[in-house]
Amino acid sequence: MKLLFGASFLAFSLALSTSSGEANTLQSVTATTPVRPENPFFGNLEPAPVGGSFTREGHIVWGGSVIRGEDGRYYMFASSWPESVTMRNWVTNSEIVLAVSDSPEGPFTYENLVLPPRGSEYWDGMITHNPSIHRHDGKYVLFYVGSTYNFERPTEMVSRETYEQVWNGKRIGVAVADSPYGPWTRFDQPILEPRPGFWDGAITSNPAPVIHEDGSALLVYKSAPVPYPARNQNKALDFGVAEAPHYLGPYHRLNNGQKIRIAGAEDERVEDPYIWQANGLYHMVAKIFSEKLTGQRESGFYAYSVDGIDWTVPDEPTAYDRRVLFTDGTIVEQKKLERPQVLVEDGRPTHLYFATADPEWSKIYNLVIPVTPGGTD
């Protein structure tokens, strides 16, 4: 078992597990030779606050991207939909909502709906999902995924056929506002389309942008080679990278349109990237489906890159796994721990936000884990 939790809480956790006689103890890890840049997450995850981050009564919350506003408050943009229609209906019922807190650890309070349905004639007319919030030159810039369909908004779990139909329509777009409260300017076209016949022929999803000081942007995205129903026989998921002279576009793919290269994870299924820039490098945290890099399935890894195309992993690439240490001393293996989003302040990751589900699927919400100071600043 790898040590992911911060040292400041380790002694307490070990004492707690020893005194209670529980078998679920933490094991020490032999230190490895330091590398640069260091993995800012491994061994630096502090306890997750019980009751922190964002839970919405009667609703599923899936993921959350947080930014500090000019007023010093923290604004979370999250995907949410009624729990009555089940988890599957993210694809038809997801909407991006705003929640606010005075602390990056929450609890966040629901404020309003950010990008409401606007009609099936629009590419993002019926659902919005995967928010990633950024700020540049006084503007709040929200990257997201949208899709559309030409039937009534579902009030119960949709069929597999309907799921596949709407999934195939996923595209990345961007909206802009002067305030986190809006109003938001949306656009009639997505910023990046799939390319039938190539590795990214099905969708564009999971936007992970860096907006540079001059307003240009680098965008890592997820795609798949074929849409449904062919996707049922080909489940590949990979990352590509594009750039634009301005974050609104136009975007063109780098690396001759080929997928990016992650050392040690070639041909592995990956999703949910988040990237930031510090010290002349791009940094990434993302989910990997296999145990190839981290030793546990459906966990997270850290990588870095000079150009956004070739990514290197450190000696210990693990960023997180599904075991979460809470401030009450409990360690819970979550059913899901996905969509890692990072709050970066002064070039350093300070908090990780996750879409999570408890072991019984009884609560699906956003969870925050503080990160011990250090890392990439």
Where are the regions that the model predicts?
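Bacterial N-terminal signal peptides
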Residues: 6-17
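Positively charged n-region of N-terminal signal peptides that target proteins for export
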Residues: 1-4
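Sec/Tat signal peptide C-region and signal peptidase I cleavage site
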Residues: 19-22
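Carbohydrate-active catalytic/glycan-binding domains of CAZyme proteins
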Residues: 24-377
